[in-house]
C-alpha cells in the first residue's frame, strides 16, 4: 500500500496555505493595490519610462524663412531597472499548540506572515525603510523631499496646523506642474482628521465622503485616498510604524509613475527538521512555516520638457505643522 511520506505531507501543507499567504500579502501591501504591478520573469528587468516630452511648433508658409520649416523634436525613454529582492519571515509554533487549537493556526500563521511582508514592502516604498540598495529609485518621500516639493500643514480659522485640506491642494498643485496627481496617501488616522475638517461656519468640508476607485479608501479633492497602518521591524528587533508621522502627514503622487515588480516564485515552505533562530524544531517538537516573496520598485521621475533637462518628482509631501 502506498504511503504518504514526510516530503509529500510538507508539499500538501505548502500548497494548502500558499493562497492564504498570497491573499494576505495583497491585502496588506497597499502599494500593490495602488500602483501598477509588473510580473517579473527574472530577477532584473529593464523598463522603458518616458523621460522627455516633445514640443510642437507653429509653421509658417514661407519657402525661405526658418519659420516655414517643420521642426524636429524627440521623445526619449530612460531605462528604469526593476531588481527583485527577497522579503522573508519564519514563524515557528509548538506541535502541542497546533493539536490543542480549535482554529486553523497554520492558516493564521500564513495570514500573519503575509501581512508582515506586505507592511515591510509598504515601508520601503513609502519612506525607504530598510530599502534594498539595489533599488536605485528613491522612496516616495525621499523623491519629494529632494525635489523640494514639500508643504507644511498651515493654519485654518485661527487653529494652528489645522489646514490639512489646503495643504493637500498645494501639494497636488506642485505635482501637477509636470505630472498628473491621482492619489493621496496617509496614515490610518488621517481619514478621521479629514472627516473632521470644518469650514468657517463649522460645517464638514467633506460631506458626504466621496467614493473613490476600486482599491482606494475614498476620495478627497479628486484624489483617491489610501491609508496605511501597522508596524515593521525597526532594525533592532523592535517596532517602527509603516507610516512615519514624524516626517509626513500625507503624500500626493501620480500613480502612473510608480511600478511595483513581483516575482512569481512567492513561496510557503513547511519546516519540521530545521534549526530556526537557535531552536532545533525536532528537539522541541515544533514546526514552522517559512514565507518568502521577491519584490522590486521603480519611480519614473525627472521628466524633461522639450530639450531642457529637468529634475522633478511625481510626488509631493505634506509635513506636520512646525509650530509658530
Please give the residue ranges for each predicted region:
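Structured loops at beta-to-helix junctions and adjacent beta-edge loops in soluble globular domains
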Residues: 48-51, 94, 187-189, 292-294, ...
